[in-house]
From Swiss-Prot:
One of its GO terms (cellular component) is cytoplasm. This is Glutamate-1-semialdehyde 2,1-aminomutase. It comes from Chlorobium chlorochromatii (strain CaD3). One of its GO terms (molecular function) is pyridoxal phosphate binding. NCBIfam families: hemL, PRK00062.1. SUPFAM superfamilies: PLP-dependent transferases. Its EC number is 5.4.3.8.
Amino acid sequence: MPQITRSIELFEKAKKFIPGGVNSPVRAFKSVGGTPIYMAKGSGAYMTDVDGNTYLDYVGSWGPFILGSMHPRITAALEYTLKNIGTSFGTPIEMEIEIAELLCQIVPSLEMVRMVNSGTEATMSAVRLARGYTGRDKIIKFEGCYHGHGDSFLIKAGSGALTLGAPDSPGVTKGTAQDTLNATYNDIESVKLLVQENKGNVAAIIIEPVAGNTGVIPAQPGFLAALRQLCDEEGIVLIFDEVMCGFRVALGGAQSLYGVTPDLTTMGKIIGGGLPVGAFGGKRKLMERVAPLGDVYQAGTLSGNPLALTAGLETLKILMDENPYPELERKAVILEEGFKANLAKLGLNYVQNRVGSMSCLFFTETPVVNYTTAITADTKKHAKYFHSLLDQGIYTAPSQFEAMFISSVMTDEDLDKTIKANYNALVASQQ
């Protein structure tokens, strides 16, 4: 077990000034117990904590670090921007046009795009746009999917809300809750029923095409296409939330992987290269309703700031130049097969779900295809598993219901180390 004296000291101090001692709930280790680890530095595939312990990083800042931490090209680009351009102006800059054009080239659904400062801003804005465009109030989301902490989304939500065992939040008004309808992921009939019960009143269906905040749950064959058809028939705006899976499962996101094009797409994480960023975009006829061109208001003081755009642009250029996706897939298969072999050796039948370089090991024998099946996982066994990995220098998400991310800079030696640690952690989970 690593020495974490300084982390303990810092957490106790943090709790005096910061609610729960953290600025995002999942970081508090509530579902796994123990003290959150305070990091001091990241480099490549590794992080070092304030006590000098080093960890192989499978959280990757919750997804953005597909290229690892402190990539030399991104670091150099940021340094140049800091020294020669500036941090923010509150005016248009040329870089905004460059990243917008690049995003429209890469992502199938994008004809126009608006930069914002977070994934939450992106999803809130996309839903507002859908309501403004259709003149309707209700939206359909899916149980366990997480679309940020906007009020409309904190109803049967995933990610940190699910981690804390509270997928709903006080402070969400009854009116908001009534306008948010929840369907079952991978169940098109549940969606059709809600649409029929609310005929002519549904503005949008928003979905993670790879649900990454209830563990990892891929859309089953035909499900997204059926949603597309239903939305076309009913005049509903289809929104893909690709904040997590965008540029992760494929350069063009899950929509390019599955061949289904939404009306609007929300993005974040990877397109910020580790800095705060978000974006939403889609069909021109919808995006032309966004202010100042149209009547649907959206604004942001720091939207499109040079630092975030620099990191995002350089990340996208590296992904296009180097095409790490085949190698990421190879590494992901190595881990998946290694974990599968370990489970077999121990006579365990736990479920592994994976799409590209994001995956989740569920501590359940029930196939995980939606929220209901995901929560059959044994969180107590997962907690033991997590701490065993941590003790072995492997940092994974401190929640059963979050994804494990591979970065392009991980070596085969790193993977071998992880597979060995996985075996030991599985043993520990059963004790």
